[in-house]
Amino acid sequence: MHNKKVTKDEKKNTKTKDVNEHIPNYIKNLPWYYQDIDKNSKNNSKEQDYLRHHRQRRDDKTIDIDNNDQAKIGTGIKDEFEVIVENKKTTIDGIIKRRKDEKDWDARKDRWYGYSGKEYEEVLKKWEKSREDLNNTTEESAYDTDEEIEMMKLGLTPKDLEQNIKGSSVRLREDKAAYLKDIYSSTTNYDPKSRLYKSDDLGSIDEHSNMFLRHLTGEGKELNDLNKFARENAKESGIRDELVDADKVNHVLVANPTKLEVLRKQKELDSLKLTEEQNRQEQRKLKRKAKLLKKKAKKPKGTPQSDSTKAQLMDMYG
């Protein structure tokens, strides 16, 4: 290790004590807020400790370090208080007086401590008022508006409620449960787990999986139709599942949903145009046939010849 150079100030301040050269500068040097105090201090003697800013107990009281080990005397209760009135400090003489509490510890720990009898009297008055209001109410106003509306819908009156007359059953006797249809049938169409009765209106049984599948409706049906169109379009373009093809990505529904949807709409429009054109051509053919039929020779119309006239003509012209 290289020996550190000692400054001139350190040599002056350390005539009697040797300076430890191994102490770093950030420990040895005084901070900026201590240097001003050191210059103004009266005990700025020649023989000063260069590590005095680290000492807890010193002879000179230039630097005050907070030491919690030593006992301290508090300032005590002040009789004068500073009050700011219109941006000016003024002192007010005052004496802090403690309130005399006549109640002892047992009184303060009592369960009814701080509770007055006047509050309970007010509660009793409220209860009496509520009882009087209930007694003064008539039978018509006893029911709430929501209850009255519900009773009107059910066709009931307050007298019916008193007599406990039950309304007619909402469900008819002819309305039987769906699972009762399987009692005398060989096949079970009711699934108790899904609570679904298998019928042709709701769905059909798949031949491959032998499972009952519901008929798709709404967006599910549209997505299924679009998936079928994507598969057919891929087959038309020569793409197969067993072969590896880079163009296969362009015909996948998940990768190109909007593209295939637009393509399907375009093909539907083209098919509509073709059907319209075919219908027009058929109408033209029918019109041509009608014109040709009008131009053909018509059978003569007149009175038929009698047998005598026919015989005379045969004799004359052979």
UniProtKB/Swiss-Prot annotation:
Which proteins does it associate with, and in what oligomeric form? Associated with the spliceosome.
Q: Tell me which InterPro entries the record gives.
A: Slu7_dom, Splicing_factor_SLU7
The primary location reported for this protein is nucleus
Please, which domain of life does this record's source organism belong to?
Answer: Eukaryota
Residues spanning the membrane: none
PANTHER family given for it?
Answer: PRE-MRNA-SPLICING FACTOR SLU7, STEP II SPLICING FACTOR SLU7
Q: Name one GO molecular function term.
A: pre-mRNA 3'-splice site binding
Q: What is this protein called?
A: Pre-mRNA-splicing factor SLU7
Q: Where is the composition biased (Basic and acidic residues)?
A: 1-21, 274-284
Q: Sorted alphabetically, which keywords does the UniProt record give?
A: mRNA processing, mRNA splicing, Nucleus, Spliceosome
Disordered as annotated region, ranges: 1-22, 37-62, 274-318
Compositional bias (Basic residues) spans?
285-301
What is one GO biological process annotated to this record? Answer: generation of catalytic spliceosome for second transesterification step
Tell me the protein family, please.
Answer: Belongs to the SLU7 family.
GO cellular component annotations of the record: Prp19 complex; U2-type post-spliceosomal complex
